[in-house]
A protein has these predicted regions:
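Metal-dependent enolase-superfamily TIM-barrel catalytic cores that perform enediolate-based chemistry
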Residues: 1-58, 69
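Glycine-enriched alpha-helix->loop->beta-strand junction motifs that scaffold or abut catalytic
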Residues: 22-30, 53-62, 81-89, 108-115, ...
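Flexible C-terminal active-site loop/helix
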Residues: 121-173
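Catalytic cores of alpha/beta
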Residues: 14-24, 70-84, 100-106, 124-139
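Active-site capping/gating regions of soluble enzymes
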Residues: 84-89, 95, 101-117, 121, ...
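A polyampholytic, Gly/Pro-enriched intrinsically disordered region
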Residues: 61-62, 85-93, 164-171
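Hydrophobic faces of well-ordered beta-strands that scaffold small-molecule active sites
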Residues: 2-8, 32-34, 62-65, 89-91, ...
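Short coil/turn segments
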Residues: 67-68, 94-95
C-alpha cells in the first residue's frame, strides 16, 4: 500500500488548518506535519494553544516537526508534548540535540503514548549513514524519512543501498 504524509511547514492559519484536516481525512492521508506555525507554549495554558486545539480535535493525525527545534531542556520538551499532545513527532537529530536529544524526545513521547519517526535534514551520506544506524537500533517500524543524500551533486560515496522501501547496508561494510 502507498501511504501519503503531507508537510505544511506551518503554512496555514488555524481556521484554514481545521478545514484542511477534514479534507485530508477524506483522502486517507497518514498525517500532516506542522499545519500551523510553531507556537510558544512555555508560558501558555493548554487551552490557549492553537496547536493543542488542532491536535485534540483532528480527523487527520498531526506530527510536530519545527515545533521541536531549539528546545533542549528536558522539562520544556515534556511540557510541550504534554500541552500539545500531538499524534506524532518527527525527529531530525541534527536539529533536536543530536542522538541524545532525540533519545530524550523519544522517551518523553513514548511515556505519553505519542508515536514518532526520524528524518534527515540535508545531511551528507556520512551523516545519513549515522542516522540510519541510529534509527535501526530504535526498532521503530514506521516508515522513516532518510533519503536526502541523493540531493547533493558533491557528496561522499555511500555503502547504503535503497531496496524497495528499505535502506540496507551490505554485510561487508
Amino acid at each position: 500500500t502507498l501511504e501519503f504524509r503531507v508537510d505544511a511547514n506551518g503554512a496555514f492559519i488555524y481556521e484554514e488548518a481545521k478545514m484542511l484536516l477534514q479534507e485530508l481525512a477524506e483522502l486517507e492521508i497518514h498525517s500532516i506535519e506542522q499545519p500551523i506555525k510553531k507556537s510558544e507554549v512555555k508560558n501558555q495554558k493548554p487551552e490557549d494553544s492553537l496547536m493543542a486545539k488542532l491536535c485534540a480535535n483532528t480527523p487527520t493525525p498531526i506530527a510536530l516537526d519545527e515545533e521541536l527545534i531549539g528546545i533542549i531542556d528536558y522539562e520544556e520538551k515534556k511540557k510541550l508534548l504534554e500541552t500539545i499532545k500531538p499524534q506524532y513527532i518527527i525527529l531530525k537529530p541534527a536539529l533536536v540535540g543530536g542522538f541524545s536529544g532525540s533519545d530524550e524526545w523519544i522517551s518523553i513521547a513514548e511515556n505519553l503514548g505519542i508515536n514518532w519517526w526520524i528524518t534527515s535534514a540535508l545531511e551528507s551520506n556520512i551523516g545519513l549513514n549515522a542516522i540510519c544506524q541510529y534509527t535501526y537500533i530504535k526498532k521503530n517500524l514506521l516508515p522513516q524519512g532518510l533519503g536526502t543524500g541523493a540531493l547533493f551533486t558533491n557528496n561522499f560515496e555511500t555503502n547504503l543501498v535503497l531496496k524497495g522501501d528499505e535502506m540496507w547496508m551490505p554485510n561487508n561494510s
